[in-house]
């Protein structure tokens, strides 16, 4: 199992109160494969550095999790298939 940090930028037209519950659907993939979700941090609506699909804003969410590489690959695949997700970025944080 490895630690990952996943940043997700969602469509700004979504209601910010529904972001965390909708992310839980995707995170069930991690839990079902034996991984764990340490933290879900919804930053809210932020201005983008450049437009993504005619959107100048996006709802940012950062998730810290521990899972197998194959599980994180499946999570990223499912997120990219969702129309409400503008961008994803999966990082492996450095261990200090």
Curated annotation (Swiss-Prot):
Entry-linked InterPro entries: Ribosomal_bS6, Ribosomal_bS6_sf, Ribosomal_S6_plastid/chlpt, Transl_elong_EF1B/ribsomal_bS6
GO biological process: translation
GO cellular component: cytoplasm; ribonucleoprotein complex; ribosome
The UniProt record lists the keyword rRNA-binding: yes
Assigned keywords, A-Z: Ribonucleoprotein, Ribosomal protein, RNA-binding, rRNA-binding
Any GO MF annotation of the entry: small ribosomal subunit rRNA binding
Disulfide bonds: none
Superkingdom to which the source organism belongs: Bacteria
Role played: Binds together with bS18 to 16S ribosomal RNA.
Name assigned to this protein: Small ribosomal subunit protein bS6
Gene of this entry: rpsF
């Amino acid at each position: 199992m490895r630690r990952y940090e996943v940043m997700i930028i969602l469509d700004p037209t979504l209601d910010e109160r529904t972001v965390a519950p909708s992310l839980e659907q995707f995170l069930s993939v991690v839990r079902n494969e034996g991984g764990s979700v340490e933290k879900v941090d919804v930053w809210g609506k932020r201005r983008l550095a450049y437009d993504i699909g005619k959107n100048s804003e996006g709802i940012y969410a950062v998730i810290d999790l521990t899972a197998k590489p194959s599980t994180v690959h499946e999570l990223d695949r499912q997120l990219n298939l969702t129309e409400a997700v503008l961008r994803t970025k999966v990082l492996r944080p450095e261990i200090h």
